[in-house]
C-alpha cells in the first residue's frame, strides 16, 4: 500500500492506550464454549506457563495469564523475517502482545503497513494503523503498545486495507498448526471479523513466534470449530510449516458470552437480530 493509498484511511487520530486498558472489561477468560474443552485447554496453559517460568525463559512480567514474552523473541522475529511469507507481505495484522513486538518493529523497518489490535478490542475503532511513512517515533518505539498511541491512529475495520499476513500470539502450539491462546478468544475474533470484512481470505497466511518450550507434540492441543490454525510456527531455532487448515469462517454468536459482546463495541454493533444467547 503506497503513501497515497494510506492517506485515505479514516481514523480518529491518536489513541489513549492507558485509558483503553483502564476502562476495558476484564474478559480475558470468557471465550465461551464447551466446558470440557475449556478445562483441557486451561490445563495445557498451566503446563506451558510452568515450563516458561521453570525454564527461566519467561521475561517480565512473568509467564502466567498472558501471551508470555520469552527470551529469544527477537531471534524468532528475525527468523520470520527471512521467510517467503514475510517477503511477500506488504500489510500485516498483528496482536498487541509483547513477544510479537519485535515482529511489529521489523515490519515497520521493512516498510510494511501494520494493523495492530487495540487491547481487548475495547474501542469502536479497534485497530491501530501503523504506517511506516507516518510515524512520529522510530519503529521500535512506535510498535509498542504505548508508542502506538503516539504514532498510530485508530481505525474502523471497514477502513483497513487487505491483509497479507496475520501474526498472532500463542501460549502453546503444535506442528499441525493447532494453537492455544490465553483464553479470551481474541485471535479467533479478530480473524473472524477480518474475514467477514473481506480483509483476509483462504490464501492469507497465519504465523506466530514462540519459544521451543511452547511447541507441544502433534494433536496435543484440543481445538474448537472456531479456532484458527497456523501456517507458520517460528521459534528462535527453526521454522515449522503447518497445514493451516481453516475452520468455517465467520462469527459464531452462540459461542460468545454476553460479557464479551458488551465489552467489545464492534461486536455490539454487528450483533444481528435473533442472535441472543439462550
Task: Cite the ranges covered by each PLM segment.
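Short, contiguous, pocket-lining structural segments
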Residues: 36, 40, 68, 72, ...
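A short, structured active-site edge motif that brings together acidic residues
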Residues: 118-123
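Surface-exposed, charge/polar-rich loops and edge strands
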Residues: 9, 13-64, 82, 110-113, ...
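A short, well-structured juxtamembrane/interface segment
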Residues: 68-87, 99-102
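Extreme N-terminal basic, low-complexity initiation segments
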Residues: 2-7
Amino acid at each position: 500500500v503506497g503513501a497515497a493509498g494510506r492517506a485515505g484511511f479514516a481514523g480518529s487520530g491518536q489513541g489513549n492506550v492507558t485509558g483503553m486498558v483502564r476502562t476495558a472489561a476484564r474478559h480475558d477468560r470468557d471465550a465461551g464454549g464447551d466446558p470440557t474443552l475449556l478445562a483441557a485447554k486451561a490445563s495445557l496453559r498451566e503446563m506451558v506457563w510452568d515450563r516458561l517460568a521453570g525454564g527461566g525463559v519467561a521475561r517480565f512480567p512473568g509467564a502466567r495469564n498472558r501471551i508470555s514474552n520469552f527470551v529469544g523473541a527477537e531471534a524468532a522475529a528475525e527468523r520470520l523475517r527471512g521467510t517467503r511469507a514475510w517477503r511477500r507481505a506488504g500489510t500485516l495484522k498483528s496482536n498487541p502482545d509483547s513477544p510479537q513486538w519485535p515482529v511489529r518493529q521489523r515490519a515497520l523497518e521493512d516498510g510494511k503497513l501494520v494493523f495492530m489490535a487495540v487491547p481487548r478490542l475495547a474501542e469502536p475503532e479497534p485497530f491501530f494503523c501503523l504506517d511506516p511513512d507516518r510515524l512520529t517515533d522510530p519503529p521500535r518505539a512506535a510498535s509498542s503498545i504505548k508508542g502506538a498511541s503516539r504514532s498510530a491512529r485508530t481505525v474502523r475495520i471497514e477502513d483497513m486495507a487487505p491483509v497479507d499476513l496475520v501474526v498472532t500470539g500463542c501460549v502453546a502450539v503444535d506442528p499441525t498448526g493447532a494453537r492455544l491462546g490465553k483464553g479470551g478468544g481474541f485471535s479467533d475474533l479478530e480473524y473472524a471479523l477480518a474475514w467477514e470484512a473481506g480483509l483476509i481470505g483462504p490464501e492469507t497466511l497465519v504465523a506466530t513466534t514462540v519459544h521451543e518450550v511452547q511447541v507441544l507434540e502433534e494433536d496435543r492441543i484440543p481445538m474448537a470449530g472456531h479456532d484458527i490454525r497456523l501456517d507458520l510456527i517460528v521459534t528462535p531455532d527453526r521454522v515449522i510449516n503447518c497445514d493451516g487448515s481453516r475452520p468455517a469462517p465467520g462469527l459464531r454468536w452462540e459461542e460468545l458470552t454476553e460479557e464479551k459482546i458488551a465489552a467489545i463495541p464492534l461486536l455490539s454493533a454487528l450483533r444481528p437480530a435473533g442472535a441472543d444467547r439462550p
